[in-house]
């Protein structure tokens, strides 16, 4: 049986491909995706948002009589302290209560609340239109992107950008909060494992039970900072490898400079550079995914990550 797959964000860091259509926004990207055997479709998703995708998929499903699927990419932030998620215990991605937990979450950050709402809307609308939905969650992803587009990630990049601008590595959290991590290859293999299972016609947990965190485990932010600070000091990007707290009101000038370096509102600096997330990956292993890299690998890879980011910034 043949399937059609539409991938959005194909030019991004996490973009993957198969037998597919790829959403692009420029002629150059269209040429690039053709080299991967994909047919480019050019449009802007701000115009055709998730709800429209799902509604249209629902029509495809009822006309063809075949199962249709929608895989939404979210992020671990949506399951963290920043998003009002519980952090006093491991939050398992196969917890049958996760949908209700997400429904009850309240975030003081509008953008994060919108991302929480997006997950809930995808699940609800998909259910309504007979579409099977999956919420795929990357976390701190590291390693070189293998696609034709963006080669570098998000959170490790924010650490380097802030350090470069301030010539020092600052931490913005009290205590020792941790966050799940994942090598880009493992992130991709979970995505592909989900696709493989769906295409094989298997009844993969979906809808309210369809959350998939791509992570081999968590690390403490400060350990990541320390490893990256050593790599940054070695390259004279920062004066020395010490990680300095920037937490209170007396540090507001420092936080203002970090804000400027990251190009985000001041209250979003801790969202970009820290926070606590106890989201824990179980679902992936249940569908046969086995990550290759343990969480500590990000610390060993910090030197290469810094090199990669500095080369691509
Ligand atoms: N990388 C991580 O560590 C990480 C962690 C957690 C969650 N995530 C989430 O995963 C998703 C993908 O991340 P990424 O690292 O691959 O991001 P990225 O490198 O910035 O790529 C974003 C992709 O989305 C496309 N895009 C953005 N706005 C669009 C629009 N309005 N219409 C059509 N296409 C649009 C971009 O196309 P152009 O090339 O044309 O701009 C690009 O292909 C994001 O939602 C991100 O928040 C990523």
Region locations from a protein language model:
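NAD(P)H-binding glycine-rich loop region in Rossmannoid oxidoreductase-like domains
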Residues: 24-66, 74, 78-79
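A conserved pocket-lining segment of Rossmann-fold NAD(P)-dependent short-chain dehydrogenase/reductase
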Residues: 158-185, 190-194, 198, 204-207
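Terminal hydrophobic/aromatic helix or amphipathic segment near a protein terminus
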Residues: 204, 213-278
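Non-catalytic, hydrophobic alpha-helical segments
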Residues: 187-191, 214, 224, 284, ...
